Amino acid sequence: MIALFAAALFVAGGTARACDTALLLAVDVSNSVDEAEYRLQIDGMADALLDPEIVLALTEGRVTLSVMQWSGVERQVMSLPWRQMLTKADVIRFSQDARALERAFVLSDTAPAEAIRFALRQFDEVEDCARHIIDVSGDGTPNSGSDTRGASQEAERAGVTINGIAIESMGVAISGFYRRALVTRDGFVITARGHRDYPRAIRIKILREVSRVVG
């Protein structure tokens, strides 16, 4: 979740180009997410990237994307490394690769603080970008790991924005936790009413994030 940077950027293929935004999409694959819900998240993300408005904003803004999966304390992995979206073909290829991702972890806890800290380290590869954003999706509150608010404050000190998609389920108030402890002060939360609402929510969120790049 980030916008505006103009500098030499890491791109697939090793070429340095100007980039406005580095956006890291962090997908929750903890124990509360079953296989069908995982597919809803992955397919929803892949579909959202192909939305014509989002394709235009990504390419005009020279946005650089990556995808990570996260769950417990030592359960984070970069599933798709940083790639810059210079053309529609770049976006289509990234969407296809995202849709093909296999789930990285199963039967694991929920540790968003450790996910945030892992994500922060990834921005070393795109440090010249003007704005850095972590886009966290999840359907649960922490049951392992360190204090989430502390990790969010570390992101603020590093100049990184955290936005969130809170996937609500019956009797679990995820949106309030995200607003209180996870997103940064310049960030925002989009609520998905269950995993089936996730495709709508992620489209809105990505469009809001990358549209800031092109006005």
Where are these regions (language model features)?
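Second-shell loop/turn segments in exported
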Residues: 26-36, 65, 81, 99-109, ...
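Von Willebrand factor
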Residues: 19-81, 85, 92-137, 163-174, 197, ...
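Sec/Tat signal peptide C-region and signal peptidase I cleavage site
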Residues: 14-18
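VWA/integrin I-like adhesion module and closely mimicked acidic/polar interface patches used
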Residues: 140-180
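Von Willebrand factor A/integrin I-like adhesion domains
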Residues: 170-214
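Sec-exported extracytoplasmic/periplasmic mature domains
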Residues: 43-54, 103, 120-128, 142, ...
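Short beta-strand-loop
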Residues: 63-98, 174-180
